[in-house]
Amino acid sequence: MAKAFSGKKPQHFGNTIRVFLNYLGRHKFMLGLVGVLTAVSALANLLGTYMIKPVVNGILETGSIPGLVRGVALTAAIYAVGALSTLGYTQTMVRAAQKVLHDIRRDLFAHLQTLPLSFFDSRRNGELMSLFTNDVDTISDALNNSFALLIQSFIQVVGTLVLLFVLNWRLSLLVVVGYAVMFWYIRFSTNRSRFFYARQQQALGDLEGYVEEMAAGQKVVKVFNHEQTNLEGFQALIARLQSAGTSAQGYSATMIPAVVSISYINYAVIAVLGGLMVMNGQSSLGSLASYLVFVRQSALPINQFTQQGNFLLAALAGAERIFNVLDEQPETDEGTVEIVRVEKSADGTLVPSAGGRRTGLWAWRDSADPAAPLVPLRGDVRFRDVSFGYIPGQTTLHDVTLYAKPGQKIAFVGSTGAGKTTITNLINRFYDITSGTITYDGIDVRKIRKSDLRRSLGVVLQDTHLFTGTVADNIRFGKLDATDEEIIAAAKIANAHSFIERLPQGYNTMVSGDGANLSQGQRQLLAIARAAVADPPVLILDEATSSIDTRTEALIEKGMDRLMEGRTVFVIAHRLSTVRNSNAIIVLEHGGIVERGSHDELLAQKGEYYQLYNGMFELA
């Protein structure tokens, strides 16, 4: 079962905030400009409100109409500056937010490319997709809507409090009490909401993973009539999402009404006491008018602070999930031996081929020694006492010793779970062995750069995966710098050229939906052509012909005979007919080798292979 991302109460919000601030810090100038413009906007609003005092007092004391006009004009100018500043920080924040989101998406995708296969084995595709959609979207909402408003609200709250004390320090003590009650309740609700926002993001990820999985497997679902079962599973997931969302939004929804209610009570009490102070001559009417407007307006930034804080909590929950993935350790590669395509120079020495041109020749050298010569790569692969387990403490392979000499075809047969595919995964170093040694031309594979090792191994995976693009693009995936001539040559080797020529646009025919517009056999032929264009010294066919009809299989076998010339080949197949001409057949059972020999030798032994061949055991 796929491992889910952590849905427990967040434990590292402090670290999440620090990493988030680091991303913001990459765009200091733009965010600094946002901060300045936000501060100007907030201060303009405060100053505009403060202007009520001199305007009202001026009218009462002098009755001067020109003075009134000047005061109103000055107030209007202050508010205009605030409006322009608001427009400026809004537009700047949009651009800054998109830059930050670009950085997060880029870093996340780039980091995923560096993670070991075991990371993807334990997680569903939909959960990973949710990181780029749901979680990034919550960050986007927070940056676009909340960042500047939080700054503005903070400045307005602090500025309002300062001006209130300037206008009337006695009444301001009551305001402080009201603020204290507000912030206590906000903190209480925030702490509760934070837990449920994290649960909500986790539920969204699980839901997207489930939908993606069911959409990909609809044919199987319908074959076995599991529509109702799937619906019940979906309803359980959306019930979890509903529960988490209701709790998160429920606590959040109480904050604004609570703040408004407290501010109204505060306002009423202060209005009564302020009126008494004016009647007793302890305050001017202008001061009270300005003071009451400040008190009334103070609820707005607090409400904004509360509301945007909710968006920020959701964003931090999403950011924590993203940053947890970014904290995953990348695939380690300490290899110094490089493998390169080579060609022979005029004097017969090996030199790297120009532009990686296909030459059929490969060589290796230790990059740690600049003077090291290029040594021809022959394709000799050996396992010595190799043990391995996908899960610590559980052994999948034990004490496996085998060899494949250059140019040999080695076939693996055995029942499901015997360890056939695991062996090919270890050759590729998709996983590292627990004990023992795997050598490639006498070099421990752990000393070879993984990228070079995999480049020298042509692989046809058990499940053919095609990408959106043309037929030529999918073949070129095996060698990104392959020329059109190399693409066609590879297709001919795989016997795919004839069917490609019959497609509507030939090699430019678009492939979409993982090759849904192609037959199983055609997809398999393209996968083999993809391996052929790589021109590798070692070829791995993981059940490459298991889903192909007899006629297509015959075409592939003819092409593969040409492709295998001079190469070391490992084959895993369902059909024993595909391994008859192997130099050696290795029979695996329960993670160990039980027999090795040629087809005739193994039949003569009348052991496991004999029983498989005669249909007494199921081959998988």
PLM features: what roles do these ranges have?
Residues E61-P66, R70, L163-V177, S247-E320, ...:
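Helix-loop-helix
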Residues V342-A620:
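ABC-type nucleotide-binding domain
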Residues A2-K8, Q98, R106-V136, G209-G233, ...:
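Short intracellular "coupling" helices and adjacent cytoplasmic loop segments at the cytosolic face
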